[in-house]
Amino acid sequence: MGILADKSGLQFKTLNTSKGPAIWSGRSQNDKDLYPLFAQELLLSTKNLTVVNSNIKEIGIDKDKIKGVITETGETVLSKCVVLCSGTFLNGILYTGMNGIAGGRIDEQSSTSISRNLLSLGFKTGRLKTGTPPRVDRNSINFSMLSEVGGDTSPKPFSFRTSSVKNTLTCHQTTTSEQTHDILRKGFSESPMFSGLIAGKGPRYCPSIEDKIERFSDKTSHQILLEREGLHTDSVYVNGFSTSLPRNIQEEGLHSIVGLEQCKILKYGYAVEYDYFYPNQLK
């Protein structure tokens, strides 16, 4: 992963440098098209590794021992060990406002059969949630009103195998305002998080914009970083504006932010709630 991050990185920064080295943390902004491309190239060129595209229906069990996985087409792939990298796909539901649709992430289906299968084997499950911000068209942003934010002067790679990395793109910074917060509050009654529609627990250090407004009501603004998602795309990630509020509220809120007054939304923000299995069940 470190090698792939170094190879596809657009900007590299060390976080928390105002404090002691023990909490310094490397961060990279990566090209969303190049990273998976390089990952595929690596996997497909790895010896003794076979990559199969298929949907898994259940884990095959024989006399309380794993025998492999069974696909939706009925094919069994034999194995003495199975590692599930489920992400947000197990019984995933995507929310924008009060509308929920099945999905692991935008434009991709969720997996329901694996959760049922593991529950039938005696595993216990819970629900988690995370979210993502809107993406906007770079050509609709007024960059003249924004401050530019670059990477480190001497960026450090993640992998010891990488001799050096360089910053390719800069980001741009703006902030929300009290007007933005008032607009977003109008949609709180249709927030799946505040209404109880989403019961899953969210990430501790990456709250949604509505959560930040609610929890830190004394703050009159919150930082927004506009990050281009790749060298060959005009899609810009609105970092700091993760939300599951209704589309009209998202649009009105974004248009109240300096530099985004005329922004065109390419994809709306959404939350995803999904199953996870308690880690203390691992042996």
Feature map (PLM): residue ranges:
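Conserved N-terminal/central alpha/beta ligand/cofactor-binding core
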Residues: 1-58, 85-105, 109, 113-115, ...
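Flexible, glycine-rich loop/tail regions that form catalytic "lids" or insertion modules at the edges
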Residues: 2, 8-12, 212-213, 224, ...
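Hydrophobic alpha-helical scaffolding
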Residues: 25-29, 104-108, 170-174, 199, ...
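A conserved hydrophobic secondary-structure block that centers on an alpha-helix together
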Residues: 59-65, 71-75
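Core beta-strand elements of the Rossmann-like FAD/NAD(P) dinucleotide-binding domain
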Residues: 70-81, 86
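Flavin (FAD/FMN) cofactor-binding core of flavoprotein oxidoreductases
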Residues: 131-138, 185-186, 196-208, 266-279
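Long, low-complexity segments enriched in small/aliphatic residues
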Residues: 147-230
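A glycine-rich dinucleotide-binding beta-alpha-beta segment and adjacent secondary-structure elements
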Residues: 237-283
